[in-house]
């Protein structure tokens, strides 16, 4: 864990071994445990079912709201457990979104926008609906298909009334590209770099 955590959150740093998971595997889609407790990019995985960890996250979101932020994007959202994940389940999404949204509404009278990045699928046969009851989610496969078809001169086939994830349009976030579009074997566009586009 970074020494910056020690500087800015000394209490969290002292308890870092309690607040990070002991599971040593890398994140992958083979099992619920591997999806929600595996290490993403070799980073330690927070114990997001711990109420103290949730409290730190809620406080950070409130600080951001106080600075004028009106929405949040959770990177790698599929790697945070849902209420439907059996023995790995938690109330993280309910607690985080309810607390942040309530705080934002009290301050502004408006609704807070929150979405999470779910690349390719939720992994381990998990459902998007476990997330969409609290947040909107990305559908990179639809965006990748549009990009693929347009760059091959097939713009007419780029339009499709159906999202590849099966998520309702009101819950889906699409993009033309992201930092993951060209990322090694996890890149889903079929391009190795932007020069091909």
What are these regions (language model features)?
Residues 1-55, 126, 130-150, 197:
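Glycan-binding loop/region signatures in secreted carbohydrate-active enzymes
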């Amino acid at each position: 864990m970074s020494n910056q955590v020690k500087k800015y959150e000394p209490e969290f740093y002292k308890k870092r071994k309690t607040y990070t998971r002991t599971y040593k595997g890398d994140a992958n889609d083979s099992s619920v445990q591997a999806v929600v407790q595996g290490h993403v990019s070799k980073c330690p995985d927070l114990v997001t079912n711990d109420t103290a960890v949730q409290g730190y996250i809620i406080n950070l979101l409130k600080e951001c709201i106080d600075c004028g932020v009106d929405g949040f994007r959770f990177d790698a959202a599929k790697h945070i457990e849902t209420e439907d994940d059996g023995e790995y389940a938690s109330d993280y999404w309910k607690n985080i979104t309810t607390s942040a949204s309530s705080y934002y509404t009290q301050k502004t009278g408006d609704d807070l926008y929150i979405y999470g990045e779910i690349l390719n699928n939720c992994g381990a046969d998990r459902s998007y609906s476990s997330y969409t009851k609290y947040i909107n989610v990305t559908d990179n496969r639809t965006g990748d298909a549009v990009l693929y078809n347009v760059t091959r001169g097939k713009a007419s086939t780029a339009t499709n009334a159906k999202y590849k994830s099966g998520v309702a349009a009101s819950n889906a976030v699409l993009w033309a590209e992201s930092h993951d579009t060209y990322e090694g074997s996890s890149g889903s566009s079929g391009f190795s770099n932007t020069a091909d586009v």
